[in-house]
A protein has these predicted regions:
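Active-site beta-loop-alpha junctions of metal-dependent nucleic acid enzymes
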Residues: 11-34, 213-220
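Active-site-proximal acidic segments at structured loop/helix or strand boundaries
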Residues: 92-191
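RNase H-like two-metal-ion nuclease catalytic core shared by retroviral integrases
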Residues: 42, 54, 74-96, 112
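Protein C-terminal end segments and domain termini
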Residues: 197-250
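Short conserved beta-strand segments at catalytic cores or DNA/RNA-binding microdomains
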Residues: 1-7, 14, 66
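RNase H-like polynucleotidyl transferase catalytic core
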Residues: 64, 68-85, 104-106
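Acidic/histidine-rich, metal-coordinating catalytic segments
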Residues: 35-55
Length: 250
């Protein structure tokens, strides 16, 4: 994301270009900027547009809810018209050249996003050619024209209600994730964000995972089954959670 007047930037990385990642990126960007502009210009992306393009674009229900929550007017570009969003097109190369040269040693997407956020903060001290103030100073000046953030954060996640199976597993987006055995065969809530899967029962988080976009994978957390294994000690030899999480050398 890039603010047109000041040139202030926000960049975040996600595993996939899906609706929840797109919406989460906007929410985090507005929080980073500290407010909402009167309008936001977008690519004619499928994750935000059901049909049409440009002035005739019809937004998805979730995106319409996002724009209503933050009170901004969405404006969509026409297909294959990169010049309509030139500031953002240039931003990709800017971040690649400055934040990733030389190539940093990063092992998780959390580390990657921390690196990107650090660069965004540093960029505020930069002064654009022909401007008298830094990007950060100009960003502060234009905030008086912005809409204050609402008191409650918009939830961009893909949320479903589902029943766990007899093995304390819940299916979400082609994969299975374990929950503590006490919640076996209970209705729970699964919230899939761009990079995380959060599982809740009665509003309380009972498990959290990195989101897996592969197919037919099962993710066990051994701690979820400890109490059950203590009651059935012989299951330690054949229990799937142990086979999948404990090294064979042990």
């Amino acid at each position: 994301m890039r603010e047109c007047y000041s040139g202030d930037i926000f960049v975040a990385a996600f595993y996939r270009q899906n609706e929840e990642s797109f919406l989460e990126g906007i929410v985090k960007g507005l929080e980073y900027f500290g407010g909402t502009p009167q309008k936001i210009i977008f690519d004619n992306a499928r994750v935000a547009v059901k049909e049409g393009f440009g002035h005739h674009a019809k937004t998805t229900d979730k995106y319409l809810a996002l724009s209503a929550h933050y009170s901004f007017r969405p404006v969509f570009c026409n297909p294959a018209q990169g010049h309509e969003k030139g500031l953002v097109e240039d931003l990709v190369g800017l971040v690649r050249r400055n934040a990733f040269v030389p190539m940093p040693n990063i092992s998780t997407i959390e580390e990657l996003n921390a690196k990107l956020l650090e660069y965004c903060s540093m960029y505020r001290s930069h002064k654009i050619s022909g401007k008298n103030m830094t990007i950060g100073e100009m960003a502060e000046n234009c905030k008086e024209h912005w809409i204050p953030l609402p008191p409650y954060r918009f939830d961009p996640s893909n949320t479903i209600q589902v029943k766990t199976d007899d093995f304390s597993l819940v299916r979400f987006d082609h994969n299975k994730y374990s929950v503590p055995y006490q919640y076996s065969s209970k209705m729970i809530t699964v919230k899939g964000s761009g990079n995380k899967v959060e599982i809740l029962f009665c509003g309380k988080t009972i498990a959290e995972y990195d989101r897996d976009y592969r197919y037919d994978r099962t993710h066990y957390c051994l701690e979820h089954y400890i109490g059950l294994i203590e009651k059935r000690p012989r299951s330690v030899y054949n229990a799937a959670p142990i086979k999948e999480t404990v090294p064979t050398e042990l």
